[in-house]
Amino acid sequence: VALKNLREEGFHATGFDRNDYIGGLWQYSEKEQTSVMETTTVNISKERACFTDFPFPEDVPSHPAAAQVQQYLVDYSKHFKLEPYMRLGTSIKQITFDDERQKWVLNIEGGDKEYYDKVVVAIGGMVGKASLPAIEGIEKFAGSNVHSQAFKRPKDYQNKRVMVVGFSNSAADTATQLVGVADKVYMAHRHGARVVR
């Protein structure tokens, strides 16, 4: 969206993405990286989740599945003819300012340097390494301890007792996916909450 808006305003903008596909975390991945779960659906309506100048197609349900959101983003880039200005599969390792040239320097993985007048950094969601909280005594726990970033398949937890720590969207999605698969699902969180069935 930033790329599209900048180009509409007359900037000669280029978009970079380290992924080799459009859609970021909305594309499900088996890799231990941040992505949606296979069964993720949007928790707001498509009318609120869409960009103002590009509604979701009529045949998409009110709360689209992750794959439908990912396709929506692909369709968005095609509709606004953004692909020629996108460099997918390109990692920016560092951004510095060259005082002599008065340009921003992008150090691209592989050793290339490119110079730009302006830089907009637009990253969404958690894109780095998972950060597990320090839990006293966790080293004594004999079971597995994984971050939601690594949770991909509910069937891996079949007939197990699972504790989901937290009450964020990811925690709620994880717990929901485990119901009916795991033997027991518990949620631990700091604040009171009501769960409505």
Positions of predicted regions on the chain:
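Glycine-rich active-site loop/strand segments that organize a redox cofactor
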Residues: 11, 18-75, 190-197
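Core beta-strand elements of the Rossmann-like FAD/NAD(P) dinucleotide-binding domain
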Residues: 108-118, 158
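Short glycine-/acidic-enriched loop or helix-start segments at secondary-structure transitions
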Residues: 2, 25, 130-132, 174-175, ...
